[in-house]
Amino acid sequence: KLDKYDEYAYSQSKDVITSLELERIMNAAGPTKGHLERLSDGKAPKEMVFIQCVGSRCADDRGKSYCSKICCMYTAKHAMLIRDKYPDVNVTVFYIDVRTPGKNFDEFYRRAVEQYGVR
């Protein structure tokens, strides 16, 4: 299904990964034993970019017209884990808008920005 969104270069670069693939990489039982590294060359990244809302809130037939309501929170979690373990890695998040629909979720997301320096 990701071929619908090839403008993000998922099929063209080993370093463009999904959130599920990142979860696997960050896992101690994963292919890199929990070490964050680029799949293309095994080196540590200097920058990580998360692109939100891909396939959600689409005006065309490639995706869904609604928000999944989970992406903002697990991106905040991933961003904080990366910044905590790798403080020299710059983390940037691109999004339509931030949606934090649960109790204290907005504080959690704000902490990623204010305490962890996620942009």
Segments from the language model and where they lie:
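Short, aromatic/basic amphipathic alpha-helical patches
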Residues: 6, 104-116
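A conserved beta-strand/loop element that lines the FAD pocket in flavoprotein oxidoreductases
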Residues: 90-93, 113-119
